[in-house]
Amino acid sequence: MKDKFSFQKNYDFNLVSDGLYEIWNNAGFFKPKDKNNSFTAILPPPNLTGTLHIGHAFEVSITDQIMRFKKMQGFSINWIPGFDHAGIATQTKYEKIALKENQKYFDADDDKKSEMIMNWALNQSEIIKNQLKSLGVCLNWSETKFTLSEQANKIVNNCFKNLYENGFIYQAYTLVNWDTKLNTAISNIEVINKPVNQHLHYVVYKLANDSKQELIVATTRPETIFADVCLLVNPKDKRYTNFWNKLVVNPLTGKQIPVVTDSYVDIKFGTGILKCTPAHDFNDYEINTKYKFDFLSCIDSNGILNQNASKFQGLSVLQARNKIVKWLEKNKLLVKSIPLTSNVGFSERSGTVVEPMLSKQWFVDLPKLKDHLYLKKYPDFIPKRFNKQVSNWLNKLKPWCISRQLIWGHKIPVWFENNTGEIVVGEKPSKNLQNYTRSKDVLDTWFSSSLWPLICLNWEQDDSFHETELLVTGYDILFFWVLRMLFNSFFETKKLPFKTVLIHGLVRDEQNRKMSKSLNNGIDPVDLIRNYGADAVRLFLCSNHTPGDDLIFSEQKIKSAWNFLNKLWNVTKFVIQLENDQEISYDLDKLSLSETWILAKLDKVIQKITKLLDKFQLALANQILVKFVWDDFCNTFIEAIKKEPNQLKPQLFYTAKSVLSNIAILLSITVPFLSERIYQQFNNKSVMQATWPLATKIKIPKLFDLVLAAINDLRNYRKQYMLNSQQKLVVILSGKNAVDVKQYFNFSWIELKIETNKKVSFKYQIVDDTTQRLKSLQKQQAFFESEVKRSQAIVKNKSFLEKAPKEKVKSEFLKLEEYQKKLTETNQLIAKLTKAH
């Protein structure tokens, strides 16, 4: 697959990547070849609510690195892509668009609305697909899945039915997170807690049989007083011992409610008395499971106070709160109101305050399901510290609310008989369908997502389920998605859905802040690819993270990645120029010192990074490879080639292209586009057809390391004594190998002399003109003394310190510090030379 590509121009990532992805895809490189040696992974399906964000780019880049590595190791890879219909997120997104562009949507029936959303969603999936392709990921597009497809629906309905029939799905009237704007139950992950400035109101509850005695209760939600069922005090709080089991009067309804003792109450908060409103607070709801008081509700599904709120009925929560506070104050039932900042839950989708609301919903009994499954083995979580976190979550499981009052999603497969209330689950009734009404609710999008492995592997067609080898995902959805996948997949198949879960962190901005719309600090990977190319973006993402930890975004590091690729491009151009038509007999025993050294170094790198990749230490493997390419190959070997005799050039080209081809293979898992172009220059096939190189255990020649150390010492000497380009160092090489290595010392600033000395292998000596060196240093000394005096005069000038910009003042102090440092170093060198002289 020799590609006619020119390396003659400057590095242009657009030209480099142009057309390559289509070639790979059309050639079938992303499709599995052998079912018996497979390595399968599933793509966490991106939501169809927008374009890819930097977190997606991070996740798919590191997964692609693993998949390409496994392919080169001989595995038949199958990385299955797909998209999540994303329920509430997609519906609200489309409805915002429809407000501006499609008013007909709001007059349509539910089926027509779903059709409109579906058309928009499918268009979004094409946009996201093209963005993924621009990153060069080796996804098997022929197996693309969708969580709201007919195929997915069969699996979803079947799982719902099986869970229901086995007693793990039930319907209950209980407290849920309620979005009063969208009129639906929502999940915990869709509730965003934000600090809100509000007031803590101290309200009077008078004793029922003695109005002169009273209890003061602090609350931020006086509008829920209508639904109070009791007051709670801590039994350790001696202030209220006389009020135990007494009755107090609800200040808004006049009804009597008891005072109950419970150790849950925080003595230090407010007055140490808690009003219990189980229909409007999750903690109160849990407390009431012990006391079994009747539930009272005073807020309806639209966030409006209902008939239980007396004259405040019909007001919104905030309107009612303000008026109730004024009424309490007027009737001398309000002691005080003090400012307080506390967290309030907001709906991620509508932005409205979330109300705890009593509602009839469908639930999966996760605690019961966990006990039933009795999983003795779990996937390997990497890093291992997440095993403990998973274990903690498993011990704190609660029933999962899976019903939503939306249009977009899998309709809950439940039909109710209109007269008897009989329930048919899974498939529509086979007889008298007209006598049944189907549930209007849809399933939580996480329910269908929890069956993603089964959807990806076509479980409805073939129930011989095979677990996937790998899942790469973020820690932020470990509970909401991964554990639920584990439960539902194992329930259906009796097998784990994946062997290994590699966990990554979030991508944070350069100030280490979580990216969010409110901070306007999101990074668009498409813009980065447009500016730096996919290879540079991928190299940054794959080289600067630790498993399980957050990645700090740095555009400067992306620029550094681009600089590395530009360096590699130019070195490739140089190697290409070495090529000629002369045939050679390539003999490993007759290689030059530099050739043996670079091949041995390459061998060591192959060993190291293969071990690291096997352990999913991806970034560390990249860092080692980049260092080898930059320092050993480009800066050392390529520079050494330039000093080798011309008669060795044909052989040197062969060695250089061999090393460069191996670099292309090693680098291709992270930098696919440029690696492909480099590999094709020297091989008649794609890098995706290459096999991962094996280490051959070549020994690094010690002599060349000695040469490199000597050259490094000479450079440091010049720097230390501040020698300019005109001042040459006289260097004597001696030893039996001196003649063999002299070409490596061929620098314009070295005057080389060779002496015969067969007693040693190799040594060098600097013939130093101490007098000349002292003169040079004394000249530098005078300059630095002058600059120190000048700078000291400036920073002692009061006028300068008062009037000059802060940055200017800071800069001058830094200059002074630097000049003082250099003067000290120069003085030390002069003293050293004077003593030696």
UniProtKB/Swiss-Prot annotation:
Instruction: Report the GO molecular function annotations.
Output: aminoacyl-tRNA deacylase activity; ATP binding; valine-tRNA ligase activity
Q: Which gene encodes it?
A: valS
The answer, when asked if RNA-binding is one of the entry's keywords, is no
This protein is called Valine--tRNA ligase
Provenance organism? Mycoplasma genitalium (strain ATCC 33530 / DSM 19775 / NCTC 10195 / G37) (Mycoplasmoides genitalium)
**Disulfide bridge map:** none
Pfam families membership: Anticodon_1 (PF08264), tRNA-synt_1 (PF00133)
Q: What does this protein do?
A: Catalyzes the attachment of valine to tRNA(Val). As ValRS can inadvertently accommodate and process structurally similar amino acids such as threonine, to avoid such errors, it has a 'posttransfer' editing activity that hydrolyzes mischarged Thr-tRNA(Val) in a tRNA-dependent manner.
What are the alphabetically sorted keywords of the record?
A: Aminoacyl-tRNA synthetase, ATP-binding, Coiled coil, Cytoplasm, Ligase, Nucleotide-binding, Protein biosynthesis
Can you cite an annotated GO cellular component?
Answer: cytosol
Q: What is known of its domains?
A: ValRS has two distinct active sites: one for aminoacylation and one for editing. The misactivated threonine is translocated from the active site to the editing site. The C-terminal coiled-coil domain is crucial for aminoacylation activity.
Sequence motif 'KMSKS' region, location on chain: 514-518
Top-rank EC class of the record's enzyme: ligase
Substrates-to-products reaction catalysed: tRNA(Val) + L-valine + ATP = L-valyl-tRNA(Val) + AMP + diphosphate
